[in-house]
Amino acid sequence: MTTIDLNCDLGESFGAYKMGNDDEILPFVSSINVACGFHAGDPSIMRQTVEKALEHNVAIGAHPGFPDLIGFGRRNMNVSASEVYDYVLYQTGALDAFVKAAGGKMQHVKPHGALYNMAASNPEIADAIAKAIYHINPSLLLYGLANSEAFIQAAEKYKVTLVQEAFADRTYKQDGTLTSRTEENALIKDEDEAIKQVLQMVKEGYVNSVNGEKVAVQAQTICLHGDGEKAVQFAERIYRTFKLNGISICAPK
């Protein structure tokens, strides 16, 4: 039986500001990435999100990003590899403390937004992320963009297990990278098209690029976005579609 992980970014609320549909989406995913306070989230939200995830028996990962609350961590920053190492170490360590305090065990680290995209094409950034993970806990998994040589090489260097990730509602360029969110066609807004793309990636191992060419994608985890108007409906559709197609949903080991 084919097995796939469904992951979602949660814990993105901040103080009085609510983001996402965390409670409603948790039943349909197998792992979550928790914002750690730099691009979103705060200590109370981190604790609450961890506790809810443990109640649902969902795997927990840190979602470190750039220190850019206003830009939600989606803007590139001119930072050194040393700074990236510090950012990841700081945020991941903070979430790990909350997970341990709640009696759980953290499973993975997935960089957020611009940090993720920069790491996918910048070996120095990817190296700094993998190095931080190695120094915190070498058994932590690294979630990174499928086919990214930067992620692959960094994971191999530090002997960190890489979980290659694909996106349900994002379009892909010919080189296998994601279409930038600054482009109008970055997101797939038609649910049926997104479902078709996900099944194609999981069952057949490829995705159609924006140019119409087939791009090989061997994904072990699929990212769902939890902050859209129909995010919960979409998550439930993917969950049920996988079940109907004999695809088992399970966090990576």
Curated annotation (Swiss-Prot):
InterPro entries, per database record: Glyco_hydro/deAcase_b/a-brl, LamB/YcsF/PxpA-like
Subunit structure: Forms a complex composed of PxpA, PxpB and PxpC.
A GO molecular-function descriptor: 5-oxoprolinase (ATP-hydrolyzing) activity
Record keywords, A-Z: ATP-binding, Hydrolase, Nucleotide-binding
Catalytic activity: 5-oxo-L-proline + ATP + 2 H2O = L-glutamate + ADP + phosphate + H(+)
Keyword Iron: no
Record carries keyword ATP-binding: yes
PANTHER family the record matches: 5-OXOPROLINASE SUBUNIT A, UNCHARACTERIZED PROTEIN YBGL-RELATED
Any one GO BP annotation for this protein: carbohydrate metabolic process
A Pfam match: LamB_YcsF
Function: Catalyzes the cleavage of 5-oxoproline to form L-glutamate coupled to the hydrolysis of ATP to ADP and inorganic phosphate.
Family to which this protein belongs: Belongs to the LamB/PxpA family.
Protein name: 5-oxoprolinase subunit A
EC numbers: 3.5.2.9
